[in-house]
Amino acid sequence: MKKDNFPPAKKVPEKYKPLPLVPEYILLPLWLVSLGAPNLIYSGILFADTLHILKWTAAGVPAAIALLIAGWRVMRYGSERVRVRLDLFALIWLAILVYCLLMPLWVNIMSPTAWCLEMVCFATVWVFYVLSASSFPEWGLRPVLLIGSINASVNVLFAELQIRGLNNFSFLDGTMFADFRRFSNIILPTPGNYIGNTAQQNMFGLWVAVAVLGGVYLYAYDAWRHDPSEHGRKAILPAVFVSLSVIILKYAVTLSSVLLGIAAALLLAAALVTGRRNIFSVSVLIMTAVNFWGLMNSTSRSATIALTLGLLVMLSVTLWKFARSYAIRFTAVLMVILCVFWASLYSPRSEQIVDKTADIIRNAENIGNRRGIWATSYAMFLEHPEGVGIGQYKWHYLEGQREGFRRFNAPLWYRWQYTHWAHNEFLQFFCEGGVIGGMLLLLMWVVWLIPALRGLIRGRHSITAGGNSEPDTNWVWAVSLVTLITFCAVFTRPFHRIENMVWLALAFALSNREFFPERLSFSILKSPSARKLTGAFCIVSSIAGCIYISSGIYGNYVLRQALSTNNEHLQLHYLNEAEKHPIVREDTMRNIGWHYMQAGEQRNNPEMLLRGFNILWSQFQREPHSEDISRLLNFAQRYQIEPALREIASYFRPGEYHLKRIPQRDASGRTVRALLLLNGPGSDDK
């Protein structure tokens, strides 16, 4: 048969080749920092915000740098070489962002500081998604998950030291390593807690759950890519060795430290038996075991159930889409996880695990003490269907709780409490974004879910057992992680930690890149003027974001200096300097109020006292917080500031307190009928 003679393809000149928004060799290191660093670092005592400011910096600045590069490349090369496309998912996300940006036009924003910070974080995560969808390399997931596993394992080590009160490295006293105690400040100083450097139990549980899911994926889908005809059998052996090591380590606590050496020998044997190049797979198994141990000892029910769902999704996809050998790999790593689960039942925190599990069964209607919080959130939504503004939930909580007591007649289960979060991210977004914002958020999830389900059902990517080609499987991890974090979002607050949101954004990007129809992606920047304008906007936004976070870092540092000095004039100087920086402005104003009140009490100066109270009361009306109630209440009773006293009293649960006029002598010796807040039921006096 005559062959067709086609002309040889012309080689595309280098200057006309298509370019990514950000080069892979630049994007991946930036993403490794943004994804790997925030959960391991904290601000420390040099800053007023001892936790978040450096986490925000580590997560956001790499995205800002990548945005700067993307803007420059768009301006320089144009749409001919740099293809800029936004899928429908990104456009809906952008619509939410724009809607929240415009909300101050019709909503009274109580705290501009919180609104601005939330908007910056929200925009940063959107940028992270767009750049990941367009430029993140498929091969980049392996180092990302490896960095995440290492980070989580170190956090588990930190948590083990914290729970034992050894986070100050006191066990090094009297040894040759005693000088290393000065490095103990790398661990969050929270002895008696099991939270690592995440600073919160559920967030620690979520982070190690994300790492466990990544470890399972690395072992089942990535570590055994070579020699697929045998990888099912080979994957079992190291899992058996690591499982035996877990069992031996469990008994080593009570039997003999000699067994620790046996366990180490088994781990070494696992590495030797599987070959030098497969030491990576053994390391992944060990870190996965450590991270699952941390998850169980965190006693976080939401994170544990979320991981279970994520693993079920991954297992279902594995059985439905891929060859039997993948299921064997998956089963091997699950064997290690089950051994760690068994060992955790004999750990010192096992009683808490059992008690919290039993509580959720006995008191299912209480939903882990969330029933009252959700009732308050529902009342807030009914009171403000247009939304209260992004980042404003916590400043409307006391008002929402007061409205909830009125609407629901304060049943016994509805106790007074205060929290910053709804412990349900979707409910909280309905409160903050209103009906429109909440529906857009749900639409975003639906737009992700439909193409993903369609792609899974159609049987794409299936291969035959013993095939010599390995499909791209990053989407398996992505779909599983979205499931995990979405479940956590129903009971906790992962959306309000940017260090979690960047992981969710990456998962969305990899999933949508695989399943989203091409017809639902839109090319933009076709005209030169739009290209230049957009590129310039990206550059300016990047620089502005870096300036904003730099200002916050310096403001936090200055505010810490103010709180650390006993010199009245120097403290006021530092406070006035810190007030210039937006991120800390509201906190600084509150501290200025306390400064004047303390100075007024020391000098017995009523004018300074009143000035301080007025500042604090103004701040309280913008940002009502439970920490301020008692001190403001005492001052209002002491100086009989009745409007403030009645407003504070209105926030308490009906029937537990009442206002009553009681005869008292004032400073001049006269008898007056002072209005006081008393315990117990009763009607309020006029």
Can you say where each PLM-predicted feature lies in the sequence?
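Hydrophobic alpha-helical transmembrane segments in integral membrane proteins
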Residues: 345-361, 530-570
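Alpha-helical transmembrane segments of multi-pass inner-membrane proteins
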Residues: 2, 18-41, 57-71, 97, ...
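A conserved mid-to-late transmembrane alpha helix and its immediate loop/hinge
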Residues: 200, 385, 410-450
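Interfacial juxtamembrane loops and adjacent helix segments
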Residues: 167-195, 354-368, 375, 379, ...
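A juxtamembrane structural motif centered on a specific transmembrane helix
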Residues: 2-21, 458-473, 507-553, 682-684
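Short, hydrophobic transmembrane alpha-helix segments
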Residues: 40-54, 75-80, 249-253
